[in-house]
C-alpha cells in the first residue's frame, strides 16, 4: 500500500515545482510517467479511502487475477500427442507453419471453452470491481480508469468499438 502514497504525493507536487523538475535533464526522463500519474489526480480519493481500496484489492481484484493466472498455468493443452502448458501452446500460435498456428488455436479454443464458466466468472467479477472503483472515483464511464492507464481518450476507444461492431459479422 506504500506505492499508493507515492502516486498521491506525486499528485501533490505543484506545477511550479514540476517545471523545475522537468528542467533538470536527469529528471526530465520521468516527465511522461509523471504526467500519466497526474491524469488520475481529478479522480483521486482521500488517503484513507485510497489505502482501503489498496488493501481490499488483495482479496478482490488481485485474488481474481491470481485465480486466472493459476488456472491458465494449470491447464493442459493436447497438441501432437503431448499435453502442453499454456506457455508452450501459446508459442505455437505464432509458429512459422500455418498448420501449427491453426491447430494450436483450435486446441486453445477448446480448452478455454471447457473452462468458460470459470473464466466468465473471473471476467465479470473483475469488471464489477473496476466499475465500483471507477464509480467511487467519479470517472465518466466504467472503463475510464483503463483508458487513462492506457493513455487513450474515451472517444478513441468508443470510435474503435463502434468501427469493430459495424464491420464484424
Segments (PLM) and residue ranges:
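A well-structured
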Residues: 1-169
Amino acid at each position: 500500500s506504500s506505492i499508493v502514497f507515492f502516486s498521491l504525493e506525486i499528485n501533490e507536487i505543484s506545477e511550479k515545482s514540476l517545471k523545475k523538475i522537468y528542467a533538470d535533464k536527469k529528471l526530465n526522463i520521468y516527465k511522461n510517467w509523471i504526467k500519466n500519474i497526474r491524469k488520475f489526480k481529478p479522480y483521486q480519493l482521500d488517503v484513507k479511502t485510497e489505502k482501503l481500496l489498496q488493501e481490499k484489492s488483495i482479496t478482490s481484484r488481485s485474488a481474481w487475477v491470481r485465480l486466472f493466472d493459476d488456472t491458465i498455468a494449470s491447464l493442459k493443452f493436447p497438441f501432437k500427442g503431448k499435453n502442453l502448458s499454456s506457455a508452450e501452446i501459446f508459442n505455437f500460435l505464432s509458429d512459422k507453419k500455418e498448420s501449427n498456428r491453426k491447430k494450436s488455436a483450435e486446441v486453445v479454443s477448446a480448452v478455454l471453452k471447457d473452462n468458460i464458466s470459470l473464466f466468465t466468472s473471473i471476467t465479470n467479477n473483475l469488471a464489477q470491481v473496476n466499475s465500483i472503483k471507477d464509480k467511487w472515483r467519479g470517472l465518466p464511464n466504467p472503463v475510464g480508469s483503463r483508458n487513462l492507464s492506457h493513455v487513450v481518450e474515451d472517444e478513441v476507444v468508443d470510435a474503435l468499438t463502434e468501427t469493430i461492431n459495424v464491420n464484424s459479422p
